């Protein structure tokens, strides 16, 4: 069982293609993380792998390195201009993040990547794909759309990557995954890599069906919540929740913070109070347009925003560095979501703080969460008289370009007027 951030395995000791090796060196990577140290010696030999690893463990670089190495080792000219590698991820944000992480390898090797995800950018994505690509990174729905239209053929695929496989199961994408894998060459004629936070029975079944005798690699922390994360729990009344949150933000003064709530409406309420109080805060929910979502994530990463209020859409798969604090304004209904939420902090060897509210509505979720993580969350008390009393009048969300539902409604109205 590995529990350190880096292993003793050096990238320079791996039999990587020289262009990939040089890119890794220039990027400043010297030692592998545990998942990289265990998976790369297998995948560089062309063997399939099913790896268990949480986000933030370096698995993206593990499969990107292997993918670029494999395509370069084949050393065949892509005259078809069709993709030779297919990387599937559950969300468009993760697709974009993987593409960003691959940029240094793209620049060093000359291999070309294309994106395929829903929400926006259809024409832009098509333009890139039409020019010929080596690696397609996408969500299942948009990739299937391109395949059925004949825009993309998967006959030339040499590498397949399934990232966050368990999450794709949770979102109901398994039929889409199987459809795409059947369009690819048979498992014996390609390298397939699967990564998942858990290697559950259903994930292993998928590996058995569509992989060629995969090697199983598991990197599991000593405790599910990570030993670098300081957890804290409060029992506020529903009436005190907002005042307690704003008081703690004033006391903790987090450098970069994510506040999770279970519903879009509650997220908007939290955003309204914090925005009115002068905090640099962004709102990330399922209704936010893709362009706006990417802009928010960039502002948060760049430090233009200090706080991000989000539903679980941002809890998994996104690489957001240097998050110092995570607040569970609502305890999640799903135990795994608790782990993935607080896993936004304490990444890459850094420490982090997680503060959760077990309120009247969601305290019922606490026993199952503590059983799942294997320990009780330390409880802290608060003095209701010491909480901030004069809460500001919350700002209201301005509907418009901000949310996709409003855009759809406006489009329908225009069509009705036209016809």
Curated annotation (Swiss-Prot):
Name by which UniProt lists this protein: ATP-dependent RNA helicase RhlB
Single GO MF descriptor: RNA binding
Enzyme superclass (EC): hydrolase
Main subcellular localisation: cytoplasm
Assigned keywords, A-Z: ATP-binding, Cytoplasm, Helicase, Hydrolase, Nucleotide-binding, RNA-binding
UniProt xrefs under InterPro entries: DEAD/DEAH_box_helicase_dom (IPR011545), DEAD_box_RNA_helicase (IPR050079), Helicase_ATP-bd (IPR014001), Helicase_C-like (IPR001650), P-loop_NTPase (IPR027417), RNA-helicase_DEAD-box_CS (IPR000629), RNA_helicase_ATP-dep_RhlB (IPR023554), RNA_helicase_DEAD_Q_motif (IPR014014)
GO biological process: one example: RNA catabolic process
Localization in the cell: Cytoplasm
Record GO cellular component, one term: cytosol
Enzyme Commission code(s) on record: 3.6.4.13
Cited function: DEAD-box RNA helicase involved in RNA degradation. Has RNA-dependent ATPase activity and unwinds double-stranded RNA.
Domain Helicase ATP-binding: start-end pairs: 40-217
Quaternary organization: Component of the RNA degradosome, which is a multiprotein complex involved in RNA processing and mRNA degradation.
Family, per entry: Belongs to the DEAD box helicase family. RhlB subfamily.
Motif DEAD box in this chain: 163-166
Gene3D superfamilies: P-loop containing nucleotide triphosphate hydrolases
Catalytic activity, as annotated: ATP + H2O = ADP + phosphate + H(+)
Ranges for domain Helicase C-terminal: 241-388
Motif Q motif per UniProt: ranges: 9-37
Highest taxon in the source lineage: Bacteria
Pfam families associated with the record: DEAD, Helicase_C
Organism whose genome encodes this protein: Histophilus somni (strain 129Pt) (Haemophilus somnus)
Annotated residues for binding of ATP: 53-60
